[in-house]
Amino acid sequence: MSVDLATVKRVARLARIAVSDQEAERMTSEINGILGFVEQLSEVNVDGVEPMTSVMPMTMKKREDVVADGDKAADIVANAPNSDRNFFVVPKVVE
């Protein structure tokens, strides 16, 4: 898999990131290098290899999962430039 210059420019536009033509060309080669490495990783045979979460064997500490609102809504939106009924109000950015 590889990406072309048009794809990089399209993704930058969707992410609302200003990218010059020179930067887009550089990013195209960097992204293609990363994708090439990922393709190499997919070729590695990992049959029989147990997934690893840490290099040190340890058990995760667990706690009871309790649902709570924290009663901090007013404190959280206190410094927001614009809020409505304890919700952040932000300008529309998605077309």
From Swiss-Prot:
Gene3D superfamilies: Glu-tRNAGln amidotransferase C subunit, N-terminal domain (1.10.20.60). InterPro entries: Asp/Glu-ADT_sf_sub_c (IPR036113), GatC (IPR003837). It is an enzyme of class 6 (ligase). Disulfide bonds: none annotated. Keywords: ATP-binding, Ligase, Nucleotide-binding, Protein biosynthesis. SUPFAM superfamilies: Glu-tRNAGln amidotransferase C subunit. GO terms for biological process: glutaminyl-tRNAGln biosynthesis via transamidation; regulation of translational fidelity; translation. GO terms for molecular function: asparaginyl-tRNA synthase (glutamine-hydrolyzing) activity; ATP binding; glutaminyl-tRNA synthase (glutamine-hydrolyzing) activity. Coiled coil: none annotated. It comes from the Bacteria. It catalyses: L-glutamyl-tRNA(Gln) + L-glutamine + ATP + H2O = L-glutaminyl-tRNA(Gln) + L-glutamate + ADP + phosphate + H(+); L-aspartyl-tRNA(Asn) + L-glutamine + ATP + H2O = L-asparaginyl-tRNA(Asn) + L-glutamate + ADP + phosphate + 2 H(+). Its EC number is 6.3.5.-. Allows the formation of correctly charged Asn-tRNA(Asn) or Gln-tRNA(Gln) through the transamidation of misacylated Asp-tRNA(Asn) or Glu-tRNA(Gln) in organisms which lack either or both of asparaginyl-tRNA or glutaminyl-tRNA synthetases. The reaction takes place in the presence of glutamine and ATP through an activated phospho-Asp-tRNA(Asn) or phospho-Glu-tRNA(Gln). Heterotrimer of A, B and C subunits. Belongs to the GatC family. This is Aspartyl/glutamyl-tRNA(Asn/Gln) amidotransferase subunit C. It comes from Sinorhizobium medicae (strain WSM419) (Ensifer medicae).
